[in-house]
Amino acid sequence: MNSKRMFSTPVFKFSFLILIIFLSIFLLINLQACESGQRVIKIGNQSVLSGEYRSFGEDQLVSVELAASKLSPVRIGGFDYEIEVVTKDDEGNPEKAFLVAQEMVDEGVAGVIGSTFDGTTIASVPVYDESGIPIISPSAQDPEISGTGDVFFRMVINNEQKVENIADFIINEINPQKIILINNQEEYSKGLVDYLREVLSDNGIETLQPMSIKINEEDAGIIAENLLIEGPDTIFYCATYNEVAALISRVKEIGLETNFITETMGMDENIFVLADAQYLEGLIAVIPEPPSLADYSQDPKAVSFWYDFNNYLNQLDEQDISIEGPGTYAPYSYDSVFVIIEAMKKSNSILPQDYIDELRTISFDGIVGHIEFDSIGDRIGPLSTVFVVKDGAWVRY
């Protein structure tokens, strides 16, 4: 049969047309699959993953990866994206952190969660600021970081805000007539007490001359006697729980009736081993965590997160992960990813220059509470939780 006549028959033309249609559909489907597979949002995870503080970084790593797994794929601007977590260890070293930030920029991350510490965050922010890439720290608390660039945001309460919350409690709940502030001679404690005194003074509450002490069993009695002479109706002591136990025991033994307040370092279950329950009764601790996350929380979102975190962690058993459960900053890391993605969705873009304005005006209810940022990237109104010793146990105030 003549081949030219065969190719020109109606049957052949129809068959060839059907073949072309099927091939076109096949290629279109595969092209779309390839395109969707290539649409990726890179989220940087910069933290300390080596050395003695690696647990902080592992906490962040698991939380960020868990959030990415919950959100992927995410639809933004009419396209579906997978979230790829780009993790780098800055070793908790500011010099290394600066280099890691540059590497993150080179890899094209659209946003960054990190860094773990104040120093590493301070070193990293200028790099991200120059490239216009938002960075959200779940754990760095130095207030001086705020406003160092237009791209820095902070998920956790900062050191000034935590003191302001302590002052707010003292002013509105205690209303002391004669208060003394005591530090334990450590840098953190001295800074906290100094700022607390300033905030109280600004609100019309003058304090007695602050005390700076390094307490031991021998000195505790002498210090207590000096306090008895001063006669304060309220004592705020920024110190570890064993130091708090030693001082409050002597103060109560000599009969000084006073409100006794501490903060995070002073709240620990082991304090009941070191002091008689009668002396600890009424001891107050103001903790820089929202009620949803603080000890004994039954908040559904928090409980669900802790459950999901542990399940995800169990899937990583073969990896070199040392932590056994979520730490303090895990929820802040988790919510940081959600907030970035929420800003992208609102802007219909994964580009930093497009979504950063939505991030600045975000209003989001996360595990850590309601999330909004002020003009310098700090959380607006982050909450603290107050505990009191009642019948030999810590309970919500």
Task: Go through each PLM region and give its residues.
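Beta-alpha junction/loop-to-helix N-cap segments that form part of ligand/metal-binding clefts
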Residues: 35-36, 40, 55-62, 74-146, ...
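Extracytoplasmic "Venus flytrap"
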Residues: 44-65, 88-94, 117, 185-190, ...
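An alpha-beta-alpha
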Residues: 49, 152-215, 233-234
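Hydrophobic alpha-helical segments within soluble ligand-binding/sensing domains
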Residues: 97, 155-179, 190-191, 218-221, ...
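Periplasmic-binding protein-like
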Residues: 104-116, 136-138, 178-183, 231-241, ...
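Extracellular/periplasmic bilobed ligand-binding domains
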Residues: 126-130, 193-291
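Extracellular/periplasmic periplasmic-binding protein-like sensory domains
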Residues: 248-334, 388-396
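Segments of small-molecule ligand-sensing domains
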Residues: 315-396
